[in-house]
């Protein structure tokens, strides 16, 4: 469930993107994404296609814990979570090969259906990092360099021979919410 802050961030995201035209809108089936997407989809008068494979990685025994709790309970530096997942060090977590394959399948679907068009994907930080890893042909563990805030925007332009990050981790709620902004 989103917190009150999360609902406010979702409304600011909707305000920022209001009036934009997207040829395709996809979203994860998970509750927090559905709640984040609602104000935006309502403002656009649109529905999103739900792609089950866009759900967040299964963190196994880490699921439901805050980062500081993971450090205390499991004795690992949660800042290195991508490395731990990629190495298979997290009990009961989704295997990295399966996660990569799942996200690759959803990416291929979205690229096929939205080739040359504006596509909006509403998903999770781990999914965004895996999409970046696949598009940039980099190991997932290196994606810890990319911060992904809640309700933030990452804009990627993909052409047949090149992927370019146009905007990353832009948080409209920082500009429209507490800070006043436009």
Regions found by a protein language model. Give the residues of each.
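Short catalytic helix/loop segments, enriched in acidic residues and glycine
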Residues: 1-12
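Short beta-strand scaffold positions
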Residues: 27-28, 101, 122-123
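Acidic, low-complexity terminal tails and accessory targeting/binding regions
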Residues: 57-69, 112-117, 133-182
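A glycine-rich beta-strand to alpha-helix segment
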Residues: 114-128
């Amino acid at each position: 469930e989103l917190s009150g802050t999360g609902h406010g961030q979702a409304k600011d995201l909707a305000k920022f993107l209001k009036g934009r035209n997207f040829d395709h809108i996809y979203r994860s089936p998970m509750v927090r994404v559905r709640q984040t997407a609602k104000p935006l989809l309502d403002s656009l008068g649109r529905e999103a296609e739900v792609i089950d494979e866009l759900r967040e990685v299964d963190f196994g025994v880490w699921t439901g814990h805050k980062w500081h709790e993971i450090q205390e309970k499991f004795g690992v530096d949660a800042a290195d979570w991508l490395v731990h997942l990629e190495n298979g060090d997290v009990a009961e977590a989704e295997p990295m090969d399966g996660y990569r394959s799942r996200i690759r399948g959803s990416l291929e679907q979205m690229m096929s259906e939205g080739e040359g068009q504006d596509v909006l994907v509403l998903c999770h930080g781990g999914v965004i990092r895996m999409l970046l890893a696949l598009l940039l042909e980099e190991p997932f563990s290196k994606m810890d360099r990319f911060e992904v805030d809640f309700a933030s925007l990452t804009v990627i332009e993909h052409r047949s021979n090149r992927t370019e990050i146009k905007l990353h981790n832009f948080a409209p709620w920082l500009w429209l919410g507490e800070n006043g902004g436009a």
